[in-house]
Protein backbone atom coordinates (compact mmCIF):
# COMPACT_ATOMS: atom_id res chain seq x y z
CA UNK A 1 0.00 0.00 0.00
CA UNK A 2 0.94 3.61 -0.37
CA UNK A 3 1.10 5.49 2.95
CA UNK A 4 0.39 9.18 2.39
CA UNK A 5 0.76 11.95 4.95
CA UNK A 6 -1.36 14.74 3.52
CA UNK A 7 -1.05 18.28 4.87
CA UNK A 8 -3.57 20.73 3.47
CA UNK A 9 -5.44 23.93 4.26
CA UNK A 10 -9.03 23.71 5.48
CA UNK A 11 -11.26 26.63 4.55
CA UNK A 12 -13.81 25.37 7.07
CA UNK A 13 -11.38 25.14 10.00
CA UNK A 14 -9.40 28.15 8.71
CA UNK A 15 -6.14 26.40 9.53
CA UNK A 16 -3.72 23.94 8.01
CA UNK A 17 -4.52 20.38 9.06
CA UNK A 18 -3.65 16.83 8.03
CA UNK A 19 -4.88 13.35 7.26
CA UNK A 20 -3.14 10.01 6.93
CA UNK A 21 -4.24 7.97 3.91
CA UNK A 22 -3.62 4.38 2.87
CA UNK A 23 -4.07 3.63 -0.83
CA UNK A 24 -4.19 0.15 -2.38
CA UNK A 25 -1.22 -1.03 -4.42
CA UNK A 26 -1.01 -4.34 -6.24
CA UNK A 27 2.23 -6.03 -5.15
CA UNK A 28 3.63 -9.44 -6.05
CA UNK A 29 7.23 -9.48 -4.86
CA UNK A 30 6.94 -7.83 -1.45
CA UNK A 31 8.03 -10.20 1.28
CA UNK A 32 5.38 -10.91 3.89
CA UNK A 33 2.59 -8.85 2.37
CA UNK A 34 0.43 -9.05 -0.76
CA UNK A 35 -1.39 -5.95 -1.91
CA UNK A 36 -4.62 -5.98 -3.93
CA UNK A 37 -5.73 -3.31 -6.38
CA UNK A 38 -7.52 -3.14 -9.73
CA UNK A 39 -8.42 -0.56 -12.35
CA UNK A 40 -11.56 0.62 -10.57
CA UNK A 41 -11.39 3.34 -7.91
CA UNK A 42 -11.05 1.50 -4.58
CA UNK A 43 -13.63 1.44 -1.80
CA UNK A 44 -12.82 3.79 1.06
CA UNK A 45 -13.03 3.60 4.85
CA UNK A 46 -13.07 6.80 6.87
CA UNK A 47 -11.39 5.76 10.13
CA UNK A 48 -11.73 8.16 13.06
CA UNK A 49 -9.45 8.52 16.08
CA UNK A 50 -10.22 8.93 19.77
CA UNK A 51 -10.15 11.88 22.16
CA UNK A 52 -6.42 11.89 22.99
CA UNK A 53 -5.17 10.95 19.52
CA UNK A 54 -4.60 12.26 16.01
CA UNK A 55 -4.57 11.22 12.36
CA UNK A 56 -1.43 9.08 12.79
CA UNK A 57 -2.57 6.93 15.69
CA UNK A 58 -4.22 4.06 13.80
CA UNK A 59 -1.06 3.44 11.77
CA UNK A 60 1.17 3.69 14.86
CA UNK A 61 -0.81 1.48 17.25
CA UNK A 62 -2.33 -1.13 14.92
CA UNK A 63 -1.42 -3.00 11.73
CA UNK A 64 -4.21 -1.31 9.78
CA UNK A 65 -1.98 -1.02 6.68
CA UNK A 66 -1.40 -4.77 6.65
CA UNK A 67 -5.07 -5.56 7.27
CA UNK A 68 -6.34 -3.21 4.55
CA UNK A 69 -3.75 -4.25 1.94
CA UNK A 70 -5.29 -7.65 1.25
CA UNK A 71 -8.75 -6.12 0.83
CA UNK A 72 -7.90 -3.44 -1.72
CA UNK A 73 -9.35 -0.84 0.65
CA UNK A 74 -8.35 2.81 0.88
CA UNK A 75 -8.33 4.18 4.43
CA UNK A 76 -8.67 7.88 5.24
CA UNK A 77 -7.72 8.92 8.77
CA UNK A 78 -8.48 12.63 9.39
CA UNK A 79 -7.44 14.87 12.26
CA UNK A 80 -10.38 15.55 14.56
CA UNK A 81 -8.81 17.18 17.61
CA UNK A 82 -10.88 16.82 20.79
CA UNK A 83 -14.00 17.96 18.96
CA UNK A 84 -16.22 14.88 19.16
CA UNK A 85 -16.56 15.57 15.45
CA UNK A 86 -18.92 18.44 16.21
CA UNK A 87 -18.96 22.09 15.23
CA UNK A 88 -17.44 23.32 18.48
CA UNK A 89 -18.83 26.34 20.29
CA UNK A 90 -15.28 27.30 21.32
CA UNK A 91 -13.18 25.79 18.56
CA UNK A 92 -13.34 24.51 15.01
CA UNK A 93 -16.25 23.45 12.83
CA UNK A 94 -15.10 19.83 12.76
CA UNK A 95 -18.49 18.37 11.84
CA UNK A 96 -18.72 20.54 8.76
CA UNK A 97 -15.09 19.79 7.92
CA UNK A 98 -15.54 16.03 8.30
CA UNK A 99 -18.85 15.61 6.52
CA UNK A 100 -18.71 18.26 3.80
CA UNK A 101 -15.18 19.48 3.13
CA UNK A 102 -13.13 16.34 3.74
CA UNK A 103 -14.93 13.96 1.33
CA UNK A 104 -14.66 16.55 -1.44
CA UNK A 105 -10.95 17.01 -0.79
CA UNK A 106 -10.36 13.26 -0.65
CA UNK A 107 -12.05 12.72 -4.00
CA UNK A 108 -10.08 15.59 -5.54
CA UNK A 109 -6.71 14.49 -4.12
CA UNK A 110 -7.04 10.71 -4.53
CA UNK A 111 -8.65 8.23 -6.91
CA UNK A 112 -11.19 6.58 -4.60
CA UNK A 113 -14.78 5.54 -5.13
CA UNK A 114 -17.54 7.97 -4.17
CA UNK A 115 -20.36 5.41 -4.45
CA UNK A 116 -22.38 4.66 -1.35
CA UNK A 117 -21.82 0.91 -1.69
CA UNK A 118 -18.05 1.52 -1.57
CA UNK A 119 -17.98 3.97 1.35
CA UNK A 120 -17.62 3.01 5.02
CA UNK A 121 -16.93 4.74 8.34
CA UNK A 122 -15.55 3.44 11.64
CA UNK A 123 -13.78 4.75 14.70
CA UNK A 124 -12.76 4.11 18.29
CA UNK A 125 -14.02 5.82 21.45
CA UNK A 126 -14.71 9.44 20.40
CA UNK A 127 -14.26 8.20 16.83
CA UNK A 128 -16.83 5.44 17.35
CA UNK A 129 -19.25 8.12 18.44
CA UNK A 130 -18.34 10.18 15.38
CA UNK A 131 -18.75 7.23 13.03
CA UNK A 132 -22.27 6.41 14.24
CA UNK A 133 -23.27 10.07 14.33
CA UNK A 134 -22.20 10.48 10.71
CA UNK A 135 -24.02 7.30 9.67
CA UNK A 136 -27.21 8.24 11.53
CA UNK A 137 -27.29 11.81 10.24
CA UNK A 138 -26.22 10.97 6.67
CA UNK A 139 -27.30 7.34 6.15
CA UNK A 140 -27.29 7.68 2.38
CA UNK A 141 -23.54 8.18 2.30
CA UNK A 142 -22.42 4.81 3.73
CA UNK A 143 -22.84 1.10 3.13
CA UNK A 144 -21.64 0.29 6.66
CA UNK A 145 -20.59 1.99 9.89
CA UNK A 146 -18.81 0.57 12.93
CA UNK A 147 -18.11 1.78 16.45
CA UNK A 148 -15.28 0.32 18.54
CA UNK A 149 -15.61 1.17 22.26
CA UNK A 150 -17.65 4.20 21.26
CA UNK A 151 -18.77 6.99 23.59
CA UNK A 152 -22.39 6.36 22.67
CA UNK A 153 -24.18 8.17 25.52
CA UNK A 154 -22.52 11.55 25.78
CA UNK A 155 -25.46 13.12 27.63
CA UNK A 156 -25.23 10.81 30.66
CA UNK A 157 -21.48 10.16 30.68
CA UNK A 158 -20.03 12.04 33.66
CA UNK A 159 -16.52 11.44 32.36
CA UNK A 160 -17.16 13.84 29.49
CA UNK A 161 -18.06 16.83 31.66
CA UNK A 162 -14.67 18.45 31.00
CA UNK A 163 -15.21 18.24 27.25
CA UNK A 164 -18.77 19.59 27.10
CA UNK A 165 -17.99 23.31 27.70
CA UNK A 166 -15.48 23.52 24.84
CA UNK A 167 -17.53 21.53 22.35
CA UNK A 168 -21.12 22.40 23.24
CA UNK A 169 -20.88 25.45 25.50
CA UNK A 170 -22.73 25.68 28.79
CA UNK A 171 -25.52 23.31 27.87
CA UNK A 172 -25.77 19.63 27.07
CA UNK A 173 -25.21 18.34 23.56
CA UNK A 174 -28.17 19.02 21.30
CA UNK A 175 -30.31 16.40 19.64
CA UNK A 176 -28.14 16.37 16.54
CA UNK A 177 -25.20 15.20 18.62
CA UNK A 178 -27.07 12.83 20.97
CA UNK A 179 -26.79 9.31 19.57
CA UNK A 180 -29.64 8.03 21.73
CA UNK A 181 -31.91 10.69 20.29
CA UNK A 182 -30.68 10.11 16.75
CA UNK A 183 -31.22 6.35 16.86
CA UNK A 184 -34.68 6.76 18.40
CA UNK A 185 -35.71 8.89 15.41
CA UNK A 186 -33.90 6.91 12.70
CA UNK A 187 -35.59 5.15 9.79
CA UNK A 188 -34.37 1.53 10.03
CA UNK A 189 -34.85 0.94 6.31
CA UNK A 190 -32.62 3.88 5.36
CA UNK A 191 -29.64 3.04 7.55
CA UNK A 192 -26.39 1.41 6.47
CA UNK A 193 -25.25 -1.82 8.10
CA UNK A 194 -24.23 -1.04 11.69
CA UNK A 195 -21.74 -2.70 14.02
CA UNK A 196 -21.05 -1.98 17.70
CA UNK A 197 -18.19 -3.56 19.66
CA UNK A 198 -17.15 -2.87 23.25
CA UNK A 199 -15.23 -5.06 25.68
CA UNK A 200 -16.85 -6.09 28.95
CA UNK A 201 -14.12 -4.39 31.03
CA UNK A 202 -14.45 -1.08 29.17
CA UNK A 203 -15.74 1.88 31.19
CA UNK A 204 -18.04 2.67 28.23
CA UNK A 205 -19.62 -0.79 28.18
CA UNK A 206 -22.82 0.26 29.98
CA UNK A 207 -23.28 3.20 27.60
CA UNK A 208 -22.95 0.86 24.62
CA UNK A 209 -25.62 -1.41 26.06
CA UNK A 210 -27.96 1.56 26.56
CA UNK A 211 -27.50 2.61 22.95
CA UNK A 212 -28.10 -0.93 21.70
CA UNK A 213 -31.31 -1.11 23.74
CA UNK A 214 -32.49 2.10 22.04
CA UNK A 215 -31.60 0.70 18.62
CA UNK A 216 -33.52 -2.52 19.27
CA UNK A 217 -36.52 -0.54 20.50
CA UNK A 218 -36.51 1.25 17.15
CA UNK A 219 -36.32 -2.05 15.26
CA UNK A 220 -32.76 -1.46 14.02
CA UNK A 221 -30.60 -4.48 13.37
CA UNK A 222 -27.05 -4.03 14.71
CA UNK A 223 -24.15 -6.46 14.56
CA UNK A 224 -22.89 -6.62 18.14
CA UNK A 225 -19.70 -7.71 19.89
CA UNK A 226 -20.27 -6.72 23.51
CA UNK A 227 -19.89 -10.01 25.38
CA UNK A 228 -16.17 -10.52 24.80
CA UNK A 229 -13.55 -9.54 27.37
CA UNK A 230 -11.69 -6.37 26.52
CA UNK A 231 -10.69 -2.99 27.90
CA UNK A 232 -10.34 0.50 26.46
CA UNK A 233 -6.95 -0.20 24.90
CA UNK A 234 -5.08 -0.83 21.67
CA UNK A 235 -4.84 -4.57 22.12
CA UNK A 236 -8.63 -4.72 21.91
CA UNK A 237 -8.88 -2.23 19.03
CA UNK A 238 -6.17 -3.91 16.96
CA UNK A 239 -8.03 -7.22 17.19
CA UNK A 240 -11.48 -5.71 16.67
CA UNK A 241 -10.64 -3.62 13.61
CA UNK A 242 -9.71 -6.88 11.88
CA UNK A 243 -13.19 -8.21 12.62
CA UNK A 244 -14.71 -4.99 11.32
CA UNK A 245 -12.75 -5.14 8.06
CA UNK A 246 -13.83 -8.75 7.54
CA UNK A 247 -17.45 -7.69 8.10
CA UNK A 248 -17.46 -4.74 5.68
CA UNK A 249 -19.43 -5.48 2.49
CA UNK A 250 -16.51 -4.78 0.18
CA UNK A 251 -17.47 -5.38 -3.44
CA UNK A 252 -15.95 -8.33 -5.25
CA UNK A 253 -14.97 -10.11 -2.06
Model feature map: region roles:
Residues 1-253:
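Non-catalytic cap/lid and distal C-terminal segments of serine-dependent acyl enzymes
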Amino acid sequence: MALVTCHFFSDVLQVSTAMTVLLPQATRSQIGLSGVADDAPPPVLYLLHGLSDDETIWTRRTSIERYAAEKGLAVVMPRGGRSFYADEVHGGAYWTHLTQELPELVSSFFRVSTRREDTFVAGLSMGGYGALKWALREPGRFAAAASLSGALDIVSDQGLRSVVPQVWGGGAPGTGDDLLGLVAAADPAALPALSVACGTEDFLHAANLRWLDAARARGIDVRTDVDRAGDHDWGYWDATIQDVLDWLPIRGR
